[in-house]
């Protein structure tokens, strides 16, 4: 696999890839932000360079990963924790993460209490429950993600072999809020050429 996002984008003979739409998918949005973080204002040119090897852009992760598992492309935008699922559930070590030298964009699943909630205390209690050891200990093998907080239990064996990105990339949330529409527009323009 490619060793960097730069290599993935600019290697004309590189692997074909399935990605998700940043308008409908948080991993797709993560890729959009990742490209912007690595390539800056050259992101549109990077998307144009990658476009010929994009097999399809799916609405969500499930559709993309399903196509990948059916052999539609040798590479898919997924989570660094995806191989743990295959190791634990299928006893299959075939699937690997492509670690990129520039770093990886941080994917965070969120839960929040709305200011307009009619049950603010119930919502707060639920958020506390989500952060409890009970829930955090089951997340790795139910949602196949790393927990938000460390618990005394540690991670299941399937995660012990996981490669962890050395560098995590992330934009300030206010910048994403202010620039997202423009960045998506640039993505649409690049992929429609």
Describe the residue ranges of each PLM region:
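A bilobed periplasmic-binding-protein/Venus flytrap-type ligand-binding module shared by bacterial periplasmic
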Residues: 36, 107-120, 138-141
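Periplasmic-binding protein-like
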Residues: 15-24, 47-51, 57-58, 90-115, 129-153
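Non-transmembrane alpha-helical segments in soluble domains
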Residues: 6-9, 36, 65, 69, ...
């Amino acid at each position: 696999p490619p060793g960097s996002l730069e290599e993935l984008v600019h290697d004309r003979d590189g692997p074909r890839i399935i990605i998700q739409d940043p308008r409908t998918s948080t991993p797709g949005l993560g890729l959009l932000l990742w490209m912007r973080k690595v390539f800056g204002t050259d992101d549109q040119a990077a998307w144009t360079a990658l476009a010929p090897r994009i097999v399809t852009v799916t609405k969500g992760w499930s559709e993309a990963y399903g196509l990948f598992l059916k052999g539609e492309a040798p590479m898919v935008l997924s989570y660094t924790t995806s191989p743990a699922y295959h190791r634990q559930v299928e006893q299959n070590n075939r699937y690997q993460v492509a670690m990129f030298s520039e770093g990886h964009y941080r994917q965070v699943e969120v839960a929040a209490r709305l200011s307009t909630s009619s049950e603010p205390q119930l919502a707060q209690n639920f958020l506390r429950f989500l952060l409890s050891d009970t829930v955090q200990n089951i997340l790795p093998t139910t949602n196949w993600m790393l927990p938000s907080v460390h618990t005394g239990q540690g991670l299941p064996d399937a995660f012990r072999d996981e490669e962890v990105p050395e560098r995590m990339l992330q934009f300030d949330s206010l910048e994403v809020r202010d620039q997202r529409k423009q960045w998506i527009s640039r993505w649409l323009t690049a992929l429609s050429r």
